[in-house]
């Protein structure tokens, strides 16, 4: 059982630390580059985070009530061994985020070197990779730096975590101040009209961009909506976890999104085009001392947050699958390797790759898992779990060979409507029927609905082994 000492303030502060990162900034800036006005972009981010807050709070409930982390909670619905499925799904996505953050760190090093007056980097792009030799070297150097940290153990980076988020807040505010001065105030900064307005270059196309963007916003934090019990298990009460999350996630995300939106809008005035990547923007500012220091600190901050957020979880998931063969270091090396093979720079070339391929594709996997966890806990079990049974190999959650057929079937069926659309968006296939592209646009919502409904039906249709589904003693649960 976890010690329960986190208050509303602790839960809210947790979200401040997680929200303030470069991908969050790029998320909002990418909407400006897609043609939205600042109001449309900020409202899209806010709405997406309000939506994902719902499964976040719901999945946080069992963490607070029973003190169990995500991998243990998943045993109730997927089975003792079947719980490896959602854990590995979450781990695979963390590997992707590791690659994206590694590219951000490598790009910061590239811009840092270019900002030095005696160094000029560039050159033709390498075949297959699509980036030049210097960019490749900076990416691999930052990747190798993280591998060294993994080898030494995650504790070697703890001291940096304490100031990573504060620095990024300062950097964001500094960029906002710079944009304010350069663009001539908030009036000109935020005056850039929506390209979807009547007579604009994208007149009549707003909804075709808004809905997939909204799905991408939900997908951005859908990973945390699964393993949020890892944090809410420390909350003193349901009130603390609910209110803390409600304060911390949508408000911080909206405010940080505004910084990204305002600065990106200002770059349209300053440079004649929207610059949504802060590392590229810092590089465009020139080689001043403050820019060099900012790029260096951004590199260190990205290193610390990437190890903590995107190595620990997948490494632990791999250890759970094969505890005798996988150590934390081996799990970290596998994560680092997979982070390269996704070619993260391809995803970040433009908002289409980042939002429409990566974030929506991620949401197609995470929505179904979240739905199964929620339906199992609230609908099937009425919030009552056999706490001891979650830790017994032959207990009530062993199902059939350690797997719950209802959960596995529901998860697989939920991928059918969105998989063709993802294959088309990722350019794995040439064409698909238009209805699959449409369903992919709503991937998280479609997957959540299909998995939730199918799981509820299958749990009634498929005969379940006799289980002792008795509530745990009151002393084991947190204050309601």
Which stretches of residues belong to each language-model region?
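C-terminal membrane-solvent junction of multi-pass transporters and transport-like membrane proteins
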Residues: 2, 369-454
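Transmembrane alpha-helical segments of multi-pass small-molecule transport proteins
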Residues: 87, 114-151, 166-175, 213-228, ...
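Membrane-interface loop-to-helix entry segments
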Residues: 89, 100, 137-181, 191-192, ...
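Membrane-water interface regions at transmembrane-helix termini and the short interhelical loops
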Residues: 30-35, 60-62, 77, 85, ...
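Hydrophobic alpha-helical segments and their helix-loop junctions in multi-pass secondary transporters
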Residues: 102, 106-115, 167-197, 220, ...
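Membrane-interface "cap" regions at the ends of multi-pass membrane proteins
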Residues: 1-39, 53, 172-175, 182-186, ...
